[in-house]
C-alpha cells in the first residue's frame, strides 16, 4: 500500500513539474497597446482576420491570434508597421513568415525607389519567427519593440 501511495505522490509531482513547462500565454492585443504607449505609436489597427488576408495574404485558418497596426500617414508614426501573429501550428507559422516577408520586401522596394532615409530604417527591421509566433516590426524603434515582444513570449 505504501508503494502505491509513494508512486501516486511521485506521479503528481512529475505532472506538476511538467505543467509549468508549457509555452507562456501572451495576449498580443495587450502587448500591442503596451508598445503603442511605450513608443508613442499613432497607428490604425487592423481588426479582423479578413484584414490580415486583405493586407498580408494571411489565411484566417493560420491565425490563433494577432495584432497589427500601420502608422497614420499624417503622424510621426507614418513609417511604422507592426504585425504580431500567433499561428495555429508550425506549418502555419512558415506560411505567415512567407507572407510577411513578401510584405517586408514590398516595403523595402518602395523605399528603395523613393526614400533613401526611410530605406536605411527599413534595412534595420526584419521578419522573425519563434515557434508559432511570427512578427514584422518596421519603425524607428523596431529593435526595442522586438525586444519587448521577445521578452513577452519567453
Predicted region positions:
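Positively charged n-region of N-terminal signal peptides that target proteins for export
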Residues: 1-11
Amino acid at each position: 500500500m505504501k508503494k502505491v501511495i509513494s508512486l501516486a505522490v511521485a506521479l503528481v509531482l512529475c505532472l506538476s513539474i511538467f505543467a509549468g513547462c508549457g509555452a507562456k500565454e501572451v495576449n498580443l492585443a495587450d502587448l500591442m497597446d503596451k508598445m503603442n504607449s511605450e513608443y508613442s505609436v499613432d497607428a490604425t489597427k487592423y481588426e479582423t482576420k479578413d484584414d490580415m488576408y486583405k493586407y498580408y495574404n494571411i489565411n484566417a485558418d493560420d491565425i490563433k491570434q494577432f495584432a497589427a497596426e500601420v502608422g497614420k500617414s499624417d503622424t510621426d508614426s507614418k513609417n511604422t508597421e507592426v504585425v504580431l501573429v500567433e499561428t495555429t501550428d508550425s506549418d502555419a507559422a512558415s506560411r505567415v513568415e512567407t507572407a510577411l516577408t513578401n510584405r517586408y520586401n514590398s516595403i523595402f522596394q518602395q523605399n528603395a525607389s523613393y526614400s533613401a532615409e526611410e530605406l536605411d530604417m527599413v534595412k534595420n527591421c526584419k521578419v522573425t519567427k519563434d515557434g508559432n509566433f511570427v512578427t514584422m516590426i518596421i519603425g524607428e524603434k523596431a529593435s526595442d519593440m522586438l525586444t519587448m515582444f521577445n521578452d513577452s513570449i519567453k
